[in-house]
């Protein structure tokens, strides 16, 4: 068949298929690739669905069919008020965020997952060539959307405690000197970063917020893994230190802590929120009413009793992976997550190509992970702290693996990681 001869949008040539989406075609025994939730509060969902079904039947038999019709209809673009109230209460009580008990719910915006929030935020903030500061490595679902909107990425290296505010400050100054303009925003995952697994200590959280305020940048805090903290102290999010809510764009999601309902709940400065609501109206009109209602019942009735079981499940999976890496991998360096889904491991040899090894050795042996180079910008710059220069991002490291412990059972994780370690030792010897 011959279709119309038209040219597709330029971004389709700039950005290849997501590496994680690409790897889904492989069916393997040992799956350490995408961060698929494997510990879900399964006992809650039959009760939630039963509760909603009984409520709907009662409405139908009482002649209030219109109430049921509304459950499967369009709703407000910014989310159902009753759902926003539940989320506001949780963020106030669990995160220590300053939200008015009576009116604070109006600041909450519901999106169809955090990924939609990312897309909408960048859609309303970025013009071509606008600069964005991100960690290195960085969540590819954020950085590639920046590229889609023709933004310029500046990736700033961190350490085992996440982003280093001093480096971010210097990178901003260097960008101003080089390009004659400051970046628009900083992106960070403060709790159990994806892909590195690092968690920022409180002093760095405060310092990073100070940098954003001093330089006049928005700070996008992606808190997808906030409730999946199974070791150490539970720290306040950066948004809790932004008392007037003028700087931090705070994103949370049900996907990791409940299930992949595609319900995100967000706080944004008022001027950003209004533009994002407008953009969402043109994007999907509203987040499905029925999934919002499922989330509402879960957080109201089941969240406290199930979240500890969820955390414990992920802790056991993390421990199985960490133990097997420490005992069976070749010499290298790994992060030590306090939560989240991922461990980041770097081979001792800088010339090791983790993508080549994946294709030629790991996949044929039934093992799947995501090569580390997938988490560096396709286009843009990497800040070098030693020289203070911004260098081309195309020369990103190739010797890292992102290993997910979220999906497989602990005994399968241990077995698969020991097998991967044996393959790595043989390959690197």
Listing of model-derived features with the role each one plays in the protein:
Residues 222:
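Glycine-centered flexible beta-alpha turn that most often forms the glycine-rich phosphate-binding loop
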Residues 39-41, 296, 312-322, 333-347, ...:
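Conserved glycine-rich beta-strand-loop-beta hairpin in the small C-terminal domain of fold type I
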Residues 331-366, 381:
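Conserved PLP-binding catalytic core of the aspartate aminotransferase-like
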Residues 67-215, 226-245, 314, 411:
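Conserved core of the PLP fold type I
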Residues 30, 149, 214-215, 365, ...:
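Helix C-cap/helix->beta junction micro-motif
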Residues 89, 382-429:
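PLP-dependent enzyme catalytic core of the Aspartate aminotransferase-like
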Residues 5-6, 11-113, 120, 300-304, ...:
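N-terminal small-domain helix-loop-helix segment of the aminotransferase-like
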Residues 243-315, 323:
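Conserved core segment of the aminotransferase class I/II
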